[in-house]
């Protein structure tokens, strides 16, 4: 399997994951206790179009414009910021994935976007080290880094996108 910028951890900046888990759990618990709908996480909200200059997804202006056009044409697919419940569940799921990593025996290629600010590259590195320690396969015992790429590898500029696709196809040739 080839994974493009997998969410094995969320990029939280300076906040430790354990603190983010605690805060998100407390916020989710309190909203459930009060019978409220799960609110957005702090600083987040409904879909708010982001300019190309400020986007965290791609360096390719045409692919970004296409993505934005889809959101304009089909508002029902627009994604806003994460809810507290989503964050809590995502943090739990990524922790569980890391815990179960040594049991994975399927050969894996982790394609890592070097300039990713959405998911944690550090956790991808840890994941590959855990697989290597368990004598399982993460191609090269480390992620395959696409230098300069943002999160959406398959929507990046052609030279970055082609590098990601070529790496995946070569991996599939070696692991039929």
Give a label for each model feature.
Residues 106, 120-131:
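Short alpha-helix in the alpha/beta-hydrolase fold that links the catalytic acid
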Residues 101-105, 130-137:
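Short, conserved loop/helix-junction motifs that constitute active-site signature segments
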Residues 104, 110-112, 116:
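Short beta-strand/loop motif that positions the catalytic acidic residue
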Residues 134-176:
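Catalytic active-site module of serine/aspartate enzymes centered on a nucleophile-bearing elbow/loop
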Residues 1-78:
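Alpha/beta-hydrolase-fold enzymes
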Residues 78-100:
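Active-site nucleophile elbow and catalytic-triad environment of alpha/beta-hydrolase enzymes
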Residues 2, 109-111, 144:
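Hydrophobic/aromatic beta-strand patches that form the interior of the parallel beta-sheet core
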């Amino acid at each position: 399997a080839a994974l493009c910028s997998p969410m094995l951890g969320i990029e939280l900046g300076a906040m430790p994951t354990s603190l983010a888990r605690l805060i998100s759990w407390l916020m989710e618990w309190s909203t459930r206790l009060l019978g409220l709908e799960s609110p957005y996480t702090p600083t987040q909200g409904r879909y708010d179009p982001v300019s190309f200059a400020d986007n965290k997804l791609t360096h390719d202006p045409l692919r970004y414009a296409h993505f934005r056009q889809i959101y304009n044409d089909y508002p029902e697919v627009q994604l806003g910021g994460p809810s507290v419940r989503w964050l809590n569940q995502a943090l739990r799921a990524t922790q569980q994935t890391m815990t179960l990593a040594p049991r994975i025996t399927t050969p894996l290629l982790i394609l890592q976007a070097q300039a990713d600010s959405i998911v944690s590259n550090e956790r991808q590195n840890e994941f590959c080290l855990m697989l290597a320690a368990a004598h399982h396969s993460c191609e090269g015992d480390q992620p395959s880094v696409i230098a300069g790429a943002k999160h959406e590898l398959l929507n990046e500029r052609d030279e970055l996108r082609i590098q990601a696709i070529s790496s995946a196809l070569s991996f599939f040739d070696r692991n039929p």
